[in-house]
Amino acid sequence: MPGIEETIVDTRENVVVAIDRWLKDNKVDRLLAYNAAFDRNHLPELKSYTWCDIMRLAAYRQYNAKIPADVACYGTGRMKRGYGVEPILRMLGEDKHYEETHNAYFDALDELKIVQLLGHEIEVYDNAVIGR
C-alpha cells in the first residue's frame, strides 16, 4: 500500500487507528468490500465511511456481463447461488480452478481483482452502498 512500507504488528486498536489515519490522509471516503456488511460490522471504528458491497454488482446480471445465460437468477437479476468470491473470480478471471486463501491481505487482493475485472467506474458503486 502506498505510504506503508513495512508490516505493522500491533494491537487491533492501534492498527485500526493507523488504517483510519491513512484513509483520512489519502482522502478516502468510501470502502469497497465483498459482503461489506460483514466487514462493516466487524470494524465499527470505520462506520463513518461509505461502505459499498462489491457483491451487489458481481452477483447481478445488469452489472456482471460474464454471468452465463444458464445461471439461475431471481427477477431482480441476482444470481440464486454461487456468487461467493471464489466462484465469481473463476467466472470473471482466467483461472477456472481458483481457490481462496482466507486472510485479510489476500481477501483484499481478491476483492480488488473482482473490482478490476468488473471494470465499472467508481460511481457505479453508488448502487452498492450499504447502511445508509
Predicted regions and their residues:
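Short, function-defining helix-loop hinge/capping sites that tune catalysis or transport
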Residues: 43, 47, 61-64, 115
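Conserved non-catalytic scaffold segment of RNase H-like nuclease domains
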Residues: 1-49, 76-79, 85-92
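Acidic active-site catalytic centers that drive phospho-/nucleotidyl reactions
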Residues: 39, 53, 107
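Acidic, Mg2+-coordinating catalytic module of metal-dependent nucleases/exonucleases
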Residues: 30-33, 42, 73-132
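Short alpha-helix plus adjacent loop in nuclease-associated cores
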Residues: 52-79
